[in-house]
Amino acid sequence: MSASSTPRPVMLVILDGFGWREDESDNAVRLANTPTFDTLWATSPHAFLKTSGEDVGLPDGQMGNSEVGHLNIGAGRVVMQELPRISRSARDGSLAQNPALLEFIAALKASGGTCHLMGLISPGGVHAHQDHVVALTKIVSAAGVPVAVHIFSDGRDTAPRSGEDFIGKFLKELPDSVQIATLSGRYYAMDRDRRWERVALAVEAIRDAKGPHAKDALSALQASYASDKGDEFVLPTVLGDYAGMKDGDGILACNFRADRIRQLLDVLVLPDFTEYDSGRKVKFAAVCGMSRYSDHLAPYMSILFPKVPLDDLLGDVVAKAGRTQLRMAETEKYPHVTYFLNGGREVQFDGEERILVPSPKVATYDLQPEMSAPELTDKAVAAIESGKFDMIVLNFANPDMVGHTGSLSAAIKACETVDQGLGRINDAIVKAGGVLLVTADHGNCETMRDPVTGGAHTSHTLNVVPVILAHARGETIHDGRLADLAPTMLALMGVKQPDAMTGVSLLESA
């Protein structure tokens, strides 16, 4: 099929966190007034995609997430994720022989410094896993290096107040010699939206031992609960007699997902950090991370688990075919339609343009469930009408980001806002003679109440997600998984699917 005979643009709209569940109870997707989605569902070919577990390269039963989802979408194949890879290394003993870890330990033994081991302590498995942190702590401690642990509490990929149980379990598994130094809610330590005032509080506690004090982690957690702040929002707290970082110490960052650990490390590690006046710079003997976090951090730290390179990605194949493409999102999901969709690489392909709309500056998105969807929609419609692009990928962040707040009413509003945007985009696609694929990367806001605890449900789900193919004449689609989206888009564009893409086009005619 020649480029001139294919529909243009082929547009993928990702409704982030918009999963499928038949039961309407506490289901923002079903309770929302979504006339555009409903009409497209009723009048267009549709199916379901699997977004969790082994279908996206995770352990069986592990919920998907935005990073994993976009990696699989962009790769057009199931991508083995860091979680099972690292877990296997910890189980079989190879982690203790990891060359980067051995070099890190040697540097600290030579300097006489402390290993500041930091990360999300949670069984959630989205950004980190506490079992990995336990394994690393035991290895470093057994080598004779003092260890100070900086706990980031979850409450987002886990129930909002579940930290007391699994942090308690984590503490019992650590060697007696380990110091528990600080406790910070991920709202502060793992911000990714350049809210430097949040990050600064975590930095002051971790680096300088400044901030509220508590005798131990569980006391700090209980005090936070007493002030009606769940795990995610624990104010960065200094524990026991922790006195801060000193020259010759080292950092071992245990998050394997990059997007929410980068900012904290930027402040602590980068010698030329200028986003705010962050105070003193510690001269670290070594800095090591679980994975590659960014190009600008890479010169200053080693990596335990380098990414397995991916070739022939969706964006790469489209560029090599001489086609144009556009990636669009607001701040919260911009890395996903760029960095993660491009295989975890900070590369911009020939003919690839990008549009970033700033996310609103609010404490939590239930306060503004519309987020920046209206502005993003304006730019999407203009891009479609421009006729410049063969492929457009757009992410609406609202269902996921508002779903994480646990507010059902706000999540309903988020879904309704996105549907309004989808309506305008659909109209523009029809006028342009294009094709529209609508789907999600994982579930979230279709389950807003925890069926076990009865409390708010703020994490992702294992549910399938819908996929709709609109305005592709004569085509029908079948069920699949996220890895099948890239082959589908290439088929719609008349571009040959490379052998490296092992996903299967959803088109029945393919």
Curated annotation (Swiss-Prot):
UniProt cofactor note: Binds 2 manganese ions per subunit.
Cellular component terms (Gene Ontology): cytoplasm
Cofactor(s), by name? Mn(2+)
Instruction: Show the catalytic activity.
Output: (2R)-2-phosphoglycerate = (2R)-3-phosphoglycerate
Pathway given for this chain reads: Carbohydrate degradation; glycolysis; pyruvate from D-glyceraldehyde 3-phosphate: step 3/5
Query: Which SUPFAM superfamilies does the protein's record reference?
Result: 2,3-Bisphosphoglycerate-independent phosphoglycerate mutase, substrate-binding domain, Alkaline phosphatase-like
Cite the binding residues for substrate.
127, 156-157, 186, 192, 257-260, 333
Q: Which residues form the active site?
A: 66
Free-text function comment from the UniProt entry: Catalyzes the interconversion of 2-phosphoglycerate and 3-phosphoglycerate.
| Family to which this protein belongs | Belongs to the BPG-independent phosphoglycerate mutase family.
The annotated subunit structure for this chain is:
Monomer.
Protein name (Swiss-Prot/TrEMBL) = 2,3-bisphosphoglycerate-independent phosphoglycerate mutase
Its source organism is: Gluconobacter oxydans (strain 621H)
Name of the gene this protein is made from: gpmI
